[in-house]
Amino acid sequence: MPKRPVLAVTAGEPAGIGPDLVLRLPELAPEARCVAIADHALLADRAAALGLNLELADYRRDRPAPAGALEVLHVPLAAPAQAGRLDPANGRYVLATLDAAIDGCVSGEFAAMVTAPVHKGVINDAGVPFTGHTEYLAERTGTGKVVMMLAGGGMRVALATTHLPLREVADAITAPLLNEVIRILHADLENKFGIDAPRILVAGLNPHAGEGGHMGREEIDVIEPALDALRAEGINLIGPLPADTLFNPDKLAAADAVLAMYHDQGLPVLKHASFGAGINVTLGLPIVRTSVDHGTALDLAGSGRADPGSLLEAVRLAEQLAGHAGRR
């Protein structure tokens, strides 16, 4: 029997639903060997609050835990954690769990990492500038540029820009940016998703993709020339297309991914189709990282009502991507 890949699963913000979700992994029974990276006592206390009769086993690299147990790589909390109540004292703890997962992936101990949600505000309140998982992973791995992609509902949607105010998006869409983003997207579709000659649909920026320049010239002046240069190298790009008709079933069936120009152009359609089971993937990293596509849901923490569907899908995709990355 092939050896199961070992995935690092960070439990995220200790006051949120991340610990609740991670504790559900044994019953969800993913094929991969999942190691929770969290404070052992935090998980034990949350399991008791949820009424879960679950064995927590200390992680040993060469000794998998018994069936039904959850393996835990212990990272200590800085202060006791209570479900639903943020404490900036634990901001650095959250980053320490990420560091353990990143280091394990870089060293080859873990095949991939899966992240439960963190709370950006409380990490910043701890005195640590933090804009999100994606940027932190890029900095820690020495990666100059990464691309955010969400998957779910039969779609893969990557973003040319991410968390920008809408008034800044048009200025951010440049030929060098598109060149870099599309190269990363194309390379990871091939190398991590195992797709040969991937087909990518590219959205325009303006309504009706600019309507021939009458509703904006970004398509004519920036996007189309950038796509033409990449097409000349053999990258299969279709667009720029009007975003309001791009997401129809026929177009999606003929493509492997969509590139949207900005966050709320591409993600509402995907989240409508996949809410509760969507996955965030960071492209361009030297490691495999997937994540849930929802937040910390402080109001649900410790209640037993948190839906683990997105975490399970993130684990499954991480295992798939790690397998492709290991073969190429």
From Swiss-Prot:
Keyword Metal-binding among record annotations: yes
- Provide the catalytic activity annotation: 4-(phosphooxy)-L-threonine + NAD(+) = 3-amino-2-oxopropyl phosphate + CO2 + NADH
Q: Does the keyword Metal-binding apply?
A: yes
- Show the Gene3D superfamilies listed in the entry: Isopropylmalate Dehydrogenase
GO CC, sorted alphabetically, is: cytoplasm
**Which family is this protein grouped under?**
Belongs to the PdxA family.
Q: What is this protein's name?
A: 4-hydroxythreonine-4-phosphate dehydrogenase
Q: State the gene name recorded for this protein.
A: pdxA
